[in-house]
Amino acid sequence: MKSVFLRAAGLLALCAVFGYIVLAALPLFRPRLETIRLERITVRDTVPVWGVFLREELVLPASDCLFRQPEASRISAGAELAPGLRSPSAGIYTAWLDGYEHLSAPALTVPALRALCGDRRMPLGSPGKLITSSRFDFYALAESAAAAGLTPGSRCTLECSYWGGIELQLTEIGESWQDFTPLHFSGSGDMDMVMYLRQVSGVLLLGEYTGLRLPDSALYTENDVLYTDVLTIGELQRTPVHVLYDAGDYK
């Protein structure tokens, strides 16, 4: 009887020791959590472009008379510009001439846009020109891969290093050729800025998004809903994610 009791006591002691070892080892078998610190960032969705501005421009006839109008002044039709010279139309006056005032809307193809500024005709003796409409066009080339997401009717902002943003609307997309896509934009207003622009390299700002950057490895889908796990005061909380911008390897 005594030996049975001793064997039972030894078994209980062994179980107690083994149980302690199992409990102590449990943390070793828990999955390791990888945590990241969330960073708030702003992402700009842009497309690099090169293009040409066209507008309604009326070159004034050559004159030896002293011109009386200041730069960028608004001129009414029939106003006296100089002795013996009256304005044939209303518009904004500028003395800036670049030899491309005769250009008209090109075919919306890559070769046509590349050749658009190949014919330069500098007016001789002219005191300047009138910009006779507040509307303008911008014909541009973009790499086809970058322009793949563009759709007619969408609005964007053209930014270049030496001018502020110009609001544009995409009116037409031409056929891609040699990895480039021709684009036709229209706009209005901002003529005090636009009247000095012709050939421009810049970027189209399609959108700007501010949010928390998350790598794809931190996201999972359940019942068609995208989630991530947020560690708050030592507890994991499943949190739905609304994607503002998908950069490929992070959102």
Residue spans for each PLM region:
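Hydrophobic membrane-insertion alpha-helices, especially the h-region
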Residues: 9-23
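N-terminal beta-strand block that forms a small beta-sandwich/beta-barrel module immediately after a flexible targeting
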Residues: 19-65, 80, 93
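Edge-of-domain interaction segments
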Residues: 19-37, 188-251
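Short, solvent-exposed secondary-structure boundary/capping segments
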Residues: 46, 50, 59-62, 98-108, ...
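Surface-exposed patches in structured soluble domains
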Residues: 52, 76, 86-141
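Exposed loop and linker-edge segments at protein-protein interfaces
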Residues: 67-84, 240, 251
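Short coil-to-beta transition motif at edge beta-strands of beta-rich domains
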Residues: 70-80, 146-159, 224-227
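Short, well-ordered beta-strand segments in soluble/periplasmic domains
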Residues: 95, 122-161, 166-174, 180-191, ...
